[in-house]
């Protein structure tokens, strides 16, 4: 992975002041509000954000591994789009399936099962916008399986993220299988959404799908100021994991990348999402302080 030569790590320490604009000097203390959130709420919070205009970063456990859950779906869609760009796949190619292929959380494939097939681009849209699990399985098979997604990640400069299993097994912890780090995922998102991994058309399409993503509305993007556009891809396991990463475009400045991964066994999803929103407020204050 590459980093801006102006990159500097920031440790921030001040009470969380809703809606405040904090001077940059306030981000140079000895404790982090992200660590404070973790201490108060329990669990393990991983966080990484980067301002692509300045190289400034905000980090907490940014290099620790977390289960990807459905955050892998954004990268899988990027891989399929890259194959389309390279002439190895066709957007309109029909992928056939039956009712026996359906698993839980598959709204698009379930609604269209009587048709017996859906186009590749519809399956991509389904996994990004609605986290359709059956569509993810069908697309994963089409690219060559989890190992092929890992290979794609290596090809875009990500030496950390790994895909090992299909849904739903990929949502269960087993060592390092199906894990990433907040820094790795945010950096990969930067590569596919802002870099030259995809054609301009494919980058715009992926970002549009992520803007229209429904499952992440109560996470990071829920606390962004009016006018800040966000394109995100969340991930969740029922038992413990609640994740989100996003490309954020504040008006009149360079884009921001942010990734938050929260592992809290036994805590309800509503409570876990509240932790991501709280972390998101810290992110907004940090980003606002750099203006």
Protein language model features and the residues they cover:
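Soluble periplasmic/extracytoplasmic beta-strand elements of cell-envelope proteins
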Residues: 46-50, 59, 75, 96, ...
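Beta-lactamase-like hydrolase cores
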Residues: 26-67
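Active-site SXXK
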Residues: 55, 67-95, 258
């Amino acid at each position: 992975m590459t980093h801006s030569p102006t990159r500097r790590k920031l440790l921030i320490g001040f009470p969380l002041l809703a809606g405040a604009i904090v001077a940059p000097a306030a981000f140079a203390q000895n404790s982090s509000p992200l660590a404070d959130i973790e201490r108060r709420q329990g669990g393990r919070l991983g966080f990484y954000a980067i301002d692509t205009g300045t190289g400034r970063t905000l980090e907490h456990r940014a290099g620790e591994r977390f289960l990807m859950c459905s955050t892998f779906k954004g990268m899988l869609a990027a891989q399929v789009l890259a194959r389309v760009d390279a002439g190895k796949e066709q957007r309109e190619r029909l992928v056939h399936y039956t009712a026996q292929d359906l698993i839980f959380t598959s709204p698009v494939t379930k609604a269209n099962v009587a048709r017996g097939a859906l186009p590749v681009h519809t399956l991509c849209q389904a996994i990004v916008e609605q986290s359709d699990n059956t569509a993810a399985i069908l697309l994963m098979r089409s690219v060559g399986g989890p190992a092929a997604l890992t290979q794609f990640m290596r090809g875009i400069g990500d030496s950390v993220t790994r895909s090992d299993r299909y849904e739903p097994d990929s949502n269960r912890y087993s060592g390092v299988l199906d894990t990433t780090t907040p820094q790795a995922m945010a950096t990969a998102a930067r590569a596919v959404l802002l870099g030259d991994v995809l054609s301009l058309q494919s980058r715009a399409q992926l970002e549009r799908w992520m803007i229209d993503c429904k499952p992440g509305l109560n996470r990071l993007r829920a606390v962004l100021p009016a006018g800040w556009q966000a394109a995100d891809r969340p991930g969740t396991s029922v038992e413990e994991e609640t994740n989100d990463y996003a490309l954020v475009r504040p008006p009149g400045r360079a884009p921001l990348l942010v990734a938050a991964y929260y592992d809290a066994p036994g805590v309800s999803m509503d409570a876990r999402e509240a932790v991501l929103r709280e972390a998101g407020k810290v992110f907004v204050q940090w980003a606002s302080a750099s203006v």
